[in-house]
From Swiss-Prot:
One of its GO terms (cellular component) is plasma membrane. Residues 23-63 are annotated as: Disordered. This is Cyclic di-GMP-binding protein. Residues 1-18 form the signal peptide. Residues 19-764 are periplasmic. Residues 786-802 are cytoplasmic. It is found in: Cell inner membrane. It is a single-pass type I membrane protein. The keyword Cell inner membrane applies. The gene is bcsB. Residues 36-46 have a biased composition (Pro residues).
Length: 802
């Protein structure tokens, strides 16, 4: 077996891609779940070198770096084979890889694909693709096919059978040498028929079921313990799914160590971004796999032995129970040095050495200013779309190129005078020459799955141009760049947003059935801009939707320097894990480590009274923090969460504060729960310790539901369900309420304060209008009275003279 593997590696060294090289596949093993899940990405076409049904050469394309890396890869493969007794087999459906529905191809959209990754510490030894689907019975079997490729390497061909439109399951073995760290599985459709057909019609099609399966067998590679490889091996950026990173803490609660751990969790969250990450907490080193150990050197687990350190230290060592596992030590002689060591990763990851150990020098981090999170687009100037995505992400190809997405984040507390909309300046280029019918083709623009505007690819001719074209003197320049400015309503902009551009192309109708080009390009100019500079930062709270979409108001300062986390004096592992998950969420939201947050126990809340507070607790241990919810409509007593009933007067007052509350949300009259069985609650209210500050309480009866509650925050599909000031969560079931008084966070210029005060408050407008009318009446009465008195005196004087 080793000899076969070496032969395969020699093939790789001479002409294969620079990728992990597999040995000959071992005997099939039972399916297992030890392999980290393959990533799921939105289904999108990953265009190959040529979108054609003709199969490419079966020999992988040569890579310039393959030969130089071959020796190292051979050694890795030999070591992996020598040290691995059991291979891991896992089966993934195309839905698990990102296909939300069947991959459908037709004449105008001939390419569908999926992207997925293989962890760098895994070696693929065998793979198989099992596909099923259907093809149009109108297709000609001799000239129509679906070609399957992996990283532009031929896998197989599907041919139509007019008498049996459905096919499968069909099995295709995949050469493991085709796999790389980031993979593209493509399905390319080619069709032809008798006669002349419009490529945009839906008569000729093929579809691959999302239930088709990819089976992969892997074995682990020997670990490369180099700090410069971080975040590997804990996280591989080619893996798109949620990540699990175990943490080991010597003591369950230590404010300084938990602060250092929070910095690390937020950095990992920054790296994982949209994928999501969770941090289970242990007191001992896991028996298998990787883990992060944080603590003072003298308090580290005994299984690691006595580590000699002379200051803040980062170190990677082998898992004592698993030679393939890596333990990252973040340590020092005291707690301050542990925090410094964590900053070495949070702020110095780009300078980490290739060695497995590093002494960290003190790091000074500058103070942050409000609303400067690296992930938030600035609101003081127009922002180029080229700053948000690569230029290649703004280019489209073919008749049905799919939507071009431009994601962006912004602080959700934006307010404009009289709800004036923001501006989007779009510049785009239509295909040159008579390729498509530009008069019937258009660019559709939307935001957050909401339609905004559509523009034809060629602007309508003026009457003079039409006259010149009629006599053959005019000239149309289809290659010109069009520019349009459109409004973006303020209510369409949230914390997480996505601009969508979709080119809808209409094929030219050529006489004599002349074939048109199959490949043409169009695109959005990277100099197109989105402008939020007419916005100010002010909003009404509580509003848990802002927390879900952008971590607001805590992320107003990217390092959370105006925030503190309040934990019980003796928290259990589930509460500490929920705290780390929340810090990971903050890091993924701001792209910045939470170096400014303070961690305190519930009996030291007054030390951070001037900050926004995040409380994580069980109801049984909430005695010291229940007073922090005194400004809310909810109370904690006897191990239960109660809602305080409104009086008629408070209801009237709420009407003046928020007249839409009765429409926007459900305000219950009574809520009582023990929050057990995995149920958790998230409550937001104004802090009783400082006006304008926020308290966010994450509560559970036994701590079991806290991790689920934090994970829900990072799931975009659930964000629309998170509203108001109370959310009850049980699994994916969410219920939102709004009952607490409102308060204002932020400021506006003096000239804008009247507009803010009247905004969405017709009752205030009525009251001010009445006062205005009374004032006008009083002024008029005074003026008329003075005029009458003066007229009376004049009449009296005139009578006296006569």
């Amino acid at each position: 077996m080793k000899m076969v593997s070496l032969i395969a590696l020699l093939v790789f060294a001479t002409g294969a891609q620079a990728a992990p090289v597999a040995s000959k596949a071992p005997a099939p093993q039972p399916a297992g779940s030890d392999l980290p899940p393959l990533p799921a990405a939105p289904p999108q076409a990953a265009p190959p070198a040529a979108a054609s049904a003709a199969p490419p050469a079966t020999t992988p394309a040569a890579d310039a770096s393959a030969a130089s890396a071959a020796d190292a890869v051979v050694d890795n493969a030999e070591n992996a084979i020598a040290g691995s007794d059991v291979a891991t087999v896992h089966t993934y459906s195309l839905r698990e890889l990102g296909a939300q529905s069947a991959l459908k191809m037709q004449g105008a959209a001939t390419l569908q694909g999926l992207q997925f990754g293989i962890p760098a510490d895994q070696l693929v030894t065998s793979a198989r693709l099992v596909v099923s689907g259907a093809m149009s019975p109108s297709l000609q079997p001799d000239t129509s096919a679906v070609t399957i490729t992996l990283n532009e390497q031929f896998i197989g061909t599907l041919r139509p059978d007019p008498t049996h439109p459905t096919f499968g399951p069909l099995s295709f073995d995949i050469n493991p040498i085709f796999f790389i760290s980031g993979n593209r599985l493509n399905f390319s459709f080619a069709s032809s028929s008798k006669g002349c057909t419009d490529p945009s019609n839906g008569l000729f099609w093929a579809s691959v079921s999302e239930h088709s399966e990819l089976q992969i067998t892997t074995i682990p590679l020997p670990p490369h313990r180099q700090l410069s490889r971080l975040p590997q091996p804990f996280f591989d950026k080619n893996v798109k799914q949620k990540i699990v990173i175990p943490f080991v803490l010597a003591q369950t609660f230590d404010p300084e160590v938990l602060k250092a751990t929070g910095i690390l969790a937020s950095w990992f969250g920054q790296q994982t971004d949209y994928r999501g990450v969770t941090f289970p907490v242990f007191s001992t080193i896991p028996q298998t796999g990787n883990a992060v150990v944080v603590g003072v050197a003298d308090e580290l687990p005994s299984a690691l032995g006595r580590q000699a350190v002379s200051g803040p230290t980062l170190m990677e060592v082998a898992n004592p129970s698993d030679p393939n596992g890596t333990i990252l030590l973040v340590t020092g002689r005291d707690r301050d040095e542990v925090i410094t060591a964590s900053k070495g990763i949070g702020f110095g990851s780009s300078t980490l050495p290739t060695a497995n150990r590093m002494d960290v020098a003190p790091i000074e981090v500058g103070a942050r200013v409000a609303n400067d999170a690296p992930s938030f687009i600035p609101t003081n100037r127009p922002v180029r779309l080229g700053e948000l995505v690569p230029d290649s992400a703004l280019q489209a190809e073919g008749y049905a190129p799919g939507a071009l997405a431009v994601p962006f984040r912004v602080s959700p507390d934006l307010y404009t005078w009289r709800d004036r909309p923001n501006k989007l300046n779009v510049r785009f280029r239509a295909p040159p020459g008579p390729i498509v019918d530009v008069s019937r083709s258009s660019l559709n623009v939307g935001i957050n799955d909401t339609y905004l505007e559509a523009y034809p690819l060629r602007e309508p001719d003026s009457p003079l141009d039409q006259l010149l074209h009629g006599v053959g003197l005019g000239h149309r320049n289809n290659d010109s760049v069009q520019q349009h400015t459109m409004p973006i309503p303020t209510y369409r902009v949230f914390g997480q947003n996505q601009l969508l551009f979709y080119f809808e192309m209409a094929a030219m109708v050529e006489p004599g059935c002349k074939p048109g080009p199959s490949t043409f390009h169009m695109g959005i100019d990277p100099n197109s801009t989105i402008d939020l500079s007419n916005s100010y930062h002010i909003t009404q709270m509580p509003n848990l939707a802002f927390m879900a979409s952008a971590g607001f108001p805590f992320t107003t300062y990217a390092d959370l320097s105006r925030s503190a986390v309040v934990l019980p004096e003796h928290p259990n592992g589930m509460i500490v894990s929920a705290y780390l998950d929340l810090m990971g969420f903050m890091g993924a939201t701001t792209w910045y480590p939470v170096s400014g947050v303070d961690v305190v126990s519930s009996d030291h809340v007054n030390d951070v009274a001037d900050r926004n507070l995040i409380v994580l607790s069980t109801l049984a241990n909430s005695g010291d923090v229940s007073q922090l919810l005194s400004n809310s409509a909810y109370q904690i007593s006897d191990g239960r969460l109660h809602m305080a009933l409104r009086s008629t007067l408070s209801g009237v007052w709420n009407l003046f504060q928020d007249p839409m509350s009765a429409i926007n949300s459900t305000a219950p009259t009574d809520v009582e729960s023990t929050l057990t069985g995995g149920v958790a609650a998230m409550v937001e209210a104004e802090s009783p310790l400082a006006s304008g500050r926020t308290v966010l309480a994450l509560l559970s009866g036994d701590g079991q539901g806290l991790n689920n509650l934090v994970q829900i925050l990072a799931q975009r599909k659930n964000q629309a369900k998170i509203q108001g000031d109370l959310v009850l969560a049980h699994g994916d079931d969410l219920t939102s309420y709004r009952s607490s008084p409102l308060y204002t966070v932020g400021t506006v210029p003096l000239w804008l304060k009247p507009d803010w005060y009247m905004h969405n408050h017709p009752s205030r407008v009525v009251v001010v209008g009445l006062f205005g009318c009374l004032l006008v009446v009083a002024v008029l009465m005074r003026a008329l009275t003075k005029h009458a008195l003066r007229r009376r005196r004049e009449l009296q004087e005139e009578r006296q003279r006569t």
